[in-house]
Swiss-Prot record:
Protein name: Transmembrane protein 069R
Keywords attached to this entry: Host membrane, Membrane, Transmembrane, Transmembrane helix
CC annotations in GO: host cell membrane; membrane
Bilayer topology term: Multi-pass membrane protein
Length: 88
């Protein structure tokens, strides 16, 4: 069986420009909240470990705490954006 016949049987088609734009828009909407949460956790990790203030008060922040900050910010963003239907 030829490849084109197989693709027709599977109803596979090449997306047009509008569909491609819709797909890229959905991916962009789904990726920015985790990226923002990661940036916030990196900033919190910097403040609590290296810090611009130079004191040793935050040197004990562990990797588990950084993951907690990341997950907390991610959950806050998820709740702030609503039910999550905009991620789909």
């Amino acid at each position: 069986m030829e490849r084109s016949a197989t693709l027709e049987m599977l109803n596979v088609h090449k997306p047009d420009a509008r569909q491609t734009g819709d797909i890229l828009s959905r991916y962009a909407n789904a990726l920015w909240p985790p990226a923002l949460a990661y940036a916030a956790s990196v900033a919190a990790g910097y403040v609590f470990t290296a810090g611009p203030h130079g004191c040793r008060c935050g040197k004990a922040m562990t990797e588990a705490a950084r993951v907690g900050v990341f997950l907390g910010v991610l959950c806050a963003l998820y709740n702030w954006m609503g039910s999550g239907d905009s991620f789909a």
